[in-house]
Amino acid sequence: MERSKLYDRIAGCLMAGALGDALGYAIEFDGWSSIQRRYGEDGITAMPVERDGKARISDDTQMTLFTNEGMVLGYWRADARGIGAEVEHYIYHAYLCWYMTQGCRPPERPLWEPVSKLLQTPELNTRRAPGNTCLAALSSGKMGSVDEPINNSKGCGGVMRTAPLGFMRCWGSALEKGAEAAAITHGHPGGWAPAGMLSDMVQRLVYDDSDAPLKDVVLASLKATEARWDLPDVHKFADMVIRAAKLSETDMPDVAAIHALGGGWVGDEALAIAVYSCLKHPDDVKAALISAVNHSGDSDSTGAIAGNILGAKLGLSALPKDWIDQLELTDVILEQAELMTNAVAHSLRLS
């Protein structure tokens, strides 16, 4: 795989996720009727810029970037030492760094505190509606896992941050590692299984050179998810994704279809909504993100996940430049994409 193509898809995944996050963050806690009164009949359709001309990201993009940084730092540490821990261990310490940016004191000193560029970025040291489950789990001093759940939460705070697990193949199964990264804070299968599937989809899209239809990628990833975890909650989640795919083939208005899937406050609903919007608008990033956020639920998370999916498929070069120009922290996002690309290229021995 060419390095330039790898970077385009990694950067596309991170940037489009941030665009969807920013678009939805402005209406995260608003009902659909309130959104229409504020933005018009079609809802929000433009970047919600503030006085400085920039739209704000939320905790979704913050945690996604820390996931990315934890993976990169962990890779180079393991490479230098010749042996390393499982990737979720490195990600856990990255989340402790994020926890510090929220004004909290972690129960242990994060491994990455001296070297985290993100921790030293002033604009990231701010609260953007962080999830209570994430904060509570990280304050506990315990690292949750799929086998040893830290709680019974199926909130979408697990899935909204795990796209980067699809970037690296050297850590093993993206499906399993994405689930483990979510299970650090979210112990219910409905919280970590969608995260695993998102990571798996991202990996298929980043490394897919056959330009397979997005629906084929979704169904292949869903099949792998059900095969890996034969659990009632996982099968229930799979049924929801199938329903989302079928709804995307109807003439039902996007808002009605999304409300039929749920509010996106929990992991399975959030991924299903994102899948719906991406399948409905597979070649139009703006349309997909507008679709994914305009509803009465967790708009920033559904927008972020939809952006991760389409960005991984279409790449940075396909994203709307006018929206990127209106987004804060694009330099930080692109730097993280470059750092990840360098690590992946090294692992794959790309020139």
Residue ranges and their predicted role:
Residues 1-351:
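Structured, active/binding-site neighborhoods that engage oxygen-rich ligands
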